[in-house]
A protein has these predicted regions:
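Conserved helix-turn-beta segment immediately C-terminal to the redox Cys motif
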Residues: 20-22, 37-58
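Short pre-active-site segment immediately N-terminal to redox-active cysteine/selenocysteine motifs
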Residues: 20-21, 28-31, 74
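Structural microenvironment flanking redox-active thiols in thiol-disulfide oxidoreductases
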Residues: 58-66
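Conserved Rossmann-like nucleotide-binding pocket used by diverse enzymes
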Residues: 3, 8, 28, 54-56
């Protein structure tokens, strides 16, 4: 089973903006209850989209620069990056089918 990679302020550009494949990023914090609720869904998506989408997680407390660059004010916030640019932003808990639909919509534009 695949797991999300850890994204930091230091590796954000190389892992996300320079990625050859779309990247789903989960901005989260250890104290955030909705973040804990969405975490298993993000884990599932990592496996389901393996090879097509890179999935990563940014701890906003440990890495404040990256969330600040994108105006992250609420967590969880999930962002999809494609070609080095933000392609979608999802704020708050969403059920798995809703997240898959949003991710699939971005992937459809990549074809």
């Amino acid at each position: 089973m695949a797991h999300p990679i850890t994204i930091t302020d230091a590796n954000f550009t190389s892992e996300v903006l320079d990625s050859d494949v779309p990247v789903l990023i989960d901005f989260w914090a250890t104290w955030c209850t909705p973040c804990k609720m969405i975490a298993p869904i993000v884990e599932d998506l990592t496996s389901e989209y393996e090879g097509r989408v890179k999935v990563g997680k940014v701890d906003v407390d440990a890495n404040p620069v990256t969330p600040g660059m994108f105006g992250i004010m609420s967590i969880p916030t999930l962002m999809v990056f494609q070609g080095g640019k933000a392609a979608d932003r999802i704020v708050g808990y969403q059920p798995k089918p809703a997240l898959k639909a949003r991710l699939d919509a971005v992937l459809a534009t990549a074809r």
